[in-house]
Amino acid sequence: MRPDLERNILLAKSIEKPWRGTYTLVGHTSAVVEAVTTLVDALGDRIISQFGLQCDFVKLRATARLAAYLHDWGKANDHFQMVVRHQSNPLQNPQLIRHEVASLLLGWQYREWLEDCPYSDFLTALAAAGGHHLKLGWNSRKQEPNDELGEIREGSGSDRLYLYMSPKYFEGMIKYGIKALDLPRQLPECVRKPPYCWQVAELKLRRSELLEAFLDWNHDPAFLGVIKALIVAGDAAGSAIPNTDLKIKDWIKKQAGTTLNEVELQQVVDERLAGQPIRPFQVALGNTSTRVSLARAGCGTGKTLGAYNWAKQYALGRKLFFCYPTTGTSTEGFIDYVHDQVDSVLLHSRSAVDLAHLAATGDEDDVETKLESFKAWGAKVSVCTVDTVLGLLQCNRRPMYCFPAIAQSAFVFDEVHCYDDRLFGGLLKFLEVVKAPVLLMSASFLPWQLEAIRKAVGEPVEVIEGAKELEILPRYKFYLSETPNWERVEQELSRTYELPNGDQSCGKVLWVCNQVGTAIAVYKEAKSRGLNALLYHSRYRYQDRVNHHRAVIKAFKKNEPVIAIATQVAEMSLDLSATLLVSQIADPAGLIQRLGRLNRRYIGRSLDAIFYPDPKVGFPYS
């Protein structure tokens, strides 16, 4: 027998004091529809051009609103209602099906009515509503993807799902649909005679019928993806913001309207130039004529500054995402360029540690986590790891929550040469789907990579070469030694260099080892010799690693002799310029990255790189 509900109210969330109308299914649905509508209106036609959609704005708006209306219909069942009323423990007795699956099945059963929603695409709205949570299509028992339309769980303690679709409980939702979405007032039989209960056999049958209907569906994947992302972001806003003193409309309009202007970008460029003239290569980046451009230049040639000059043309009236392959490089890119200069935010899985201002990631329904994710909505510049953006196409949580920012941004992807096959494949898919301004930067692009990029973009791509006069400068002298030469290290730390601009610089040594144990031993030897030594390796706890990372960067910026002993973490995330490199022999790619830290700020002549063998040949990083 179906349990009666107190005051005949369907809940969307568990109740906390003080009472808010958004705890009810009608109230929450109204909040999400309002959030999605405001978001679509704020983004306007740009969302269509950003993703190359074939629909018009009216269809996009109507479909997004219908999906928002449908997204939580499936909460009108006894399993869910008992959970939010704390009368059932989902860990002990999981719900028979996820509420998103129930939303799909109910929406399909009510299709005769819902298909009459003006200007909307019903099937796209239904699919987006059913996929708005990120666990759909996942077998929680086997911890693997589920090809079926959601799993029917074991251990629920029941073989049936009672539904609350009768007027006694669901009339408010029907009336809201008529009022807000202009759905027909004349209700067809499927609405007048709603389902009461689904047993497992009927659930499987209805699921199969829906899957069969979708098999013949000729849909636009980009359109579906955009609607789904809007629902995820709108649901997050509709869940979190009503629990604050903020008004959804006002907040979303303000965040979406915060975009870059030329004065701010010029400020970043001028700050970094520090009175020096801008290089022709950097000027050329600002004058590119294609939507997608490539900057091919080596370390220390000014690619990052050139990228902000590029943004002066392509990110005006937009937001800007600056994407790095690692948390270390994204953190340093944030601190060195835009922190305290432009409304900006650092986004990656460990940015809470880096900035000490983000809450720890919790459950996907945690209000605080969602509110913290919204910082990207209002930031003009987001500096992040590349997965923060590319993960959008895999429906990862953070980029889905950041979608309102991604939907109106220009993008810079740095250090593309460091991407593995998975990341590069994700980049190609992004270039194929997203039609935003994009700048790709790398020390090198292989011919097959250039061909793949051009094919994915499907339109002309301009390649801007770095300053040849800088790249051909003699930066290194190579020496091979059987053992480390401490006398040479001490000699380097006592040196003073005359810089091309007339300034002077003390000697600075970067010593890179292949194993943490070796690095610790070298560090102890350096300290025993009375040297100003710093240790930085990959086995520190992340919070400590961030502190050591910054200590090394800070020490190399001072005009004092210093030696930093590091492991392979130095290969990518250390933006410093050493006057002597000492390194164990490693793989070629690693050695090239290590050399990128030697003479990075050109001293006026070539400097020494000393390599010595690693006794653990074949296991350089173990």
Predicted regions and their residues:
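Walker A/P-loop
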Residues: 288-311
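Interdomain hinge/linker at the junction between the two RecA-like core domains of SF2 helicases
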Residues: 445-502
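Accessory nucleic-acid engagement/destabilization modules that flank
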Residues: 2-257
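Conserved strand-helix element at the start of the C-terminal RecA-like helicase core
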Residues: 319-330, 500-527, 534-535
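Post-DEXD/H (motif II) to motif III coupling segment of the RecA-like Helicase ATP-binding lobe
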Residues: 400-413, 417-468
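Inter-Walker segment of RecA-like/P-loop motor cores
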Residues: 342-395
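Conserved Walker A/P-loop ATP-binding site and its immediately adjacent core
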Residues: 313, 317-351, 445-450, 516
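Conserved segment of the helicase C-terminal RecA-like domain
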Residues: 109, 597-622
